[in-house]
Curated annotation (Swiss-Prot):
Pfam families: PRK (PF00485). It comes from Geobacillus sp. (strain WCH70). Its main location: cytoplasm. The gene is udk. It catalyses: uridine + ATP = UMP + ADP + H(+); cytidine + ATP = CMP + ADP + H(+). The keyword Nucleus does not apply. This is Uridine kinase. Its EC number is 2.7.1.48. It is found in: Cytoplasm. InterPro entries: P-loop_NTPase (IPR027417), PRK/URK (IPR006083), Uridine_kinase (IPR026008), Uridine_kinase-like (IPR000764). HAMAP family: Uridine_kinase. Belongs to the uridine kinase family. GO terms for molecular function: ATP binding; cytidine kinase activity; uridine kinase activity.
Length: 211
């Protein structure tokens, strides 16, 4: 039986610091052996829908994600085959025509708010992580990200948080904490937790004869 990459799932609420955790792990191993696969890139294609209908998309609901494609891509990466990762256009609220070529690596970090929600995804993971951060900090980070990076207005972000993000977090995201092997408070700023994770990843890599 050939070697298979290590898959790490990093979940947590929007603005919890998942990306910081993924980046901190990435920096320990470097580009040669690790890749980050963001669930955000795998929102469903909505090009068949009128723009007004796309505006009503609930991006925090499990059904917003094309997990079938994501799982297909993970299986390819586990076979050391490259993938063409989709790109999502947040201004048009649908999948872009562009794709990103991704080469397989020894460590795959799967990062997203609901990566622990789908049992099929969980079954592909060697380590399951939940990043736990105060709601106040999460909403501030989401405000800054959506306004600066996604062209949103302050009013629209606040309205979406109150009507969609917070209830979806409580209903779908927070409950996935029970599936986590590791719960990390404070995200990427928790250096002790990051170091412990890096040590665990190295152990798994050694067991799989990568190191």
């Amino acid at each position: 039986m050939g070697k298979k990459p290590v898959v790490i799932g990093v979940a947590g609420g929007s603005g919890s610091g998942k990306t910081s955790v993924a980046r901190a792990i990435y920096e320990h191993f470097g580009d040669r052996s690790i890749l980050v696969l963001e669930q955000d890139f795998y929102y469903k294609d909505q090009s068949h829908l009128p723009f007004e209908e796309r505006l009503r998309t609930n991006y925090d609901h499990p059904l917003a994600f094309d997990n079938d494609l994501l799982i297909e891509h993970i299986h390819k990466l586990l076979r050391y085959e490259p993938i063409e990762k989709p790109v999502y256009d947040y201004k048009l609220h649908t999948r872009s025509d562009k794709v990103i070529h991704v080469e397989p690596k020894d460590v795959i970090i799967l990062e997203g708010i609901l990566v622990l929600e789908d049992e099929r995804l969980r079954n592909l993971m060697d380590i399951k992580v939940y990043v736990d951060t105060d709601a106040d900090i999460r909403i501030i980070r989401r405000l800054l990200r959506d306004i600066n990076e996604r062209g949103r207005t302050l009013e629209s972000v606040i309205e979406q948080y109150v009507s969609v993000v917070r209830p979806m977090h409580n209903q779908f995201v927070e409950p996935t904490k029970r599936y986590a092997d590791i719960i990390i408070p404070e995200g990427g700023h928790n250096h002790v937790a990051i170091d412990l994770m890096v040590t665990k990843i190295r152990t798994i890599l050694e067991q799989k004869s990568f190191l």
